[in-house]
């Protein structure tokens, strides 16, 4: 089998997602491997989203455990996004029994960066007045869309921070990074005008299963695949008319 995800103590031993279980156990002999429980994950996710709705109706879900919230029009806590985030995290901890990290910032790009800053149980705030200073020192690998290939290209150009990217013109960014250059021009300055998409339509539907033991033959895999296909059909049937097979 493979590791779907792991907690932060396990990561300190070098364990990470998509790693073979055997390799993970060699790195961390005391590792406890538990089977996934997606029904439970979906139930907990629904509980958390119910708490979100106490503070705003402008919610853009990203996954079972992540979402953007626009609280700019909220009258709670004197319209303090920081205090709303504090209250929300406390509600989730007390009612659901898990920790939540939150990032407070003027836009989605910076909010995502901020939410990752103090994981697994923290709150990080980027006030509007501090955006310029914060972004200038931000490593380029924190920019959404900068993966291994783009990161290597930036390293070859000695571009280490968003401040370094700011030294390049729109034209130069386009020459080096193609159509992504225009988006880089704005993101490296902390600019992101994307609105919250409350009616966001899912672009895919999937099913998955992690196995305790490797399947040895093609026949074994085909037998398992039949079961997954049936589950996928069931999931399609539960979706609305937006999903067509």
Stretch-by-stretch model annotation:
Residues 47, 51-55, 87-96, 153, ...:
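Generic non-transmembrane alpha-helical segments
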Residues 62-66, 105-108, 241-245:
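Short Gly/Ser/Thr- and Asp/Glu-enriched loop/turn motifs at secondary-structure junctions
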Residues 1-64, 68, 75:
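Residues that scaffold, gate, or flank divalent-cation-dependent active/transport sites
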Residues 142, 150-245:
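DNA-contacting surface of Y-family translesion DNA polymerases
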Residues 69-89, 158:
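Catalytic palm subdomain of template-directed nucleic-acid polymerases
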Residues 2-6, 110-118, 156, 195-200:
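Short acidic, glycine/serine/threonine-rich loops at helix termini
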Residues 80-141:
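Long, highly charged, low-complexity intrinsically disordered interaction regions
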């Amino acid at each position: 089998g493979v590791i779907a995800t792991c907690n932060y103590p396990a990561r300190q031993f070098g364990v990470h997602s998509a790693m073979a279980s055997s390799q993970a156990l060699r790195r961390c002999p005391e590792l406890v491997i538990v089977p996934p429980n997606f029904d439970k994950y979906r139930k907990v996710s629904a509980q958390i989203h119910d708490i979100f709705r106490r503070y705003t109706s402008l919610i853009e879900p990203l996954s079972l455990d992540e979402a953007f919230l626009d609280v700019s029009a909220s009258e709670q806590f004197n319209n303090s996004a920081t205090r709303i985030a504090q209250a929300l995290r406390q509600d989730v901890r007390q009612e659901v029994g898990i920790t939540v990290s939150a990032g407070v910032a003027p836009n989605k790009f910076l909010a995502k960066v901020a939410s990752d800053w103090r994981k697994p149980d923290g709150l990080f705030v980027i006030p509007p007045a501090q955006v310029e200073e914060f972004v200038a020192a931000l490593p380029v690998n924190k920019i959404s869309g900068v993966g291994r290939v783009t990161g290597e290209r930036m390293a070859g150009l000695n571009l280490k921070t968003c401040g370094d990217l700011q030294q390049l013109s729109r034209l130069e960014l386009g020459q080096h990074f193609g159509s992504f250059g225009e988006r880089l021009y704005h993101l490296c300055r902390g600019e992101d005008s994307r609105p919250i998409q409350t009616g966001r339509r899912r672009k895919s539907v999937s099913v998955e299963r992690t196995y305790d033991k490797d399947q040895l033959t093609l026949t074994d895999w085909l037998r398992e695949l039949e079961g997954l296909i049936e589950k996928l059909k069931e999931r399609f049937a539960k979706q609305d008319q937006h999903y067509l097979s």
